[in-house]
């Protein structure tokens, strides 16, 4: 059985003449009805009336099905209403051929409807992934929250304060992490890796490998006795190398789950932790655990990564001790950081002069040609934090353009100016080791029209956000990425939270730079989309 009825949309954006196309289709023996634009009230009324007055199998020829397919399907009731995209057709011949091809396809007779799985996989336990998981679970949907790190929380858990309100980051994030862990419909799978994704929307099979912690999570109480006796000291990745830690440790004080982990590559097998643990939680024979999950939808909240500052060698990162990244600065001023919040250089010296350099990697055709969005306001926030710790510190921000476009961001910028933060337009050419100061920044003031050398104790590089490019193992090809490596969407305006794979959704910075509030919004947005998806049967 094939279709022979066409509902032709008189969309003003079509590149072909609708009446001419209707005439050609009529001459081909088809029943054609031209409707006002179907995305208008008049067009919707016309479509409803047409389907009621002339029942049967219709085909809609309009703009892209990605934009309005769901709307057309709802109006079709029980029937199957395919949509042919005419926006891509430049000539009458091509438009006619596309419609005739679609009309020639067989119509499935009485397709079996299978209820989709009412479970969802969320990949990434940052604030966006946690928000999506909580919204889904609160709607009665089972969630598997997979996080590659030892704790959920993501980058936000490493920050001291958030902008523009300067709230304590972990103070507002911590309760959300605890809520996610305690929710009866959320299963945390931390220190885990997705090893396979197969299937389709409503019916995905996902393989997950849980790496061994060498600690029994059901017995560990997070007391830290094991770390106290461990003799192996290694750099702390959580503190970005600014502090050391033990081979066995809890990743940070507010970690969820609050469980110790042994990194076997550093372990010398002294078994002192085994003796020190009063709860018999140490299990040196742990093996990886394999899980198979059946889910109806997948949320990718895998985040982004900071630009590698070593590429900008003129700034001396990794060579000059006083040159830090903006995330390292956050750890330096954080009360739970390597100095317990004491504002000092990595060498332990007081900070009297501080400078921020913007757009490190961003807005540079050699590296990241786009604006990373968050960096200007983050640097202003960090300048205010420096003044909170040391009111007499001299703070300078070297900028390309100040872009504070979020709610309350411009007000924070004005507060920083009033507090004495100096803004110099122009990105420095290089950073040198100084004779009378740790560092000297060589710059050109584009507004003042002069060159200068600024002695500072610390220079903070505001890094752009780059795509992580971590590929997930989709059996039939994963979501398409854009030119910069971020996940793309079928439509950047109408379907910005969806990937190019049906049933796979995007939250947070995996699809482009975002700040925390935007990331939280995307988490809630994908949850709403999935709740609607899992209501419907799937063929």
What are these regions (language model features)?
Residues 1-539:
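Residues forming the flavin
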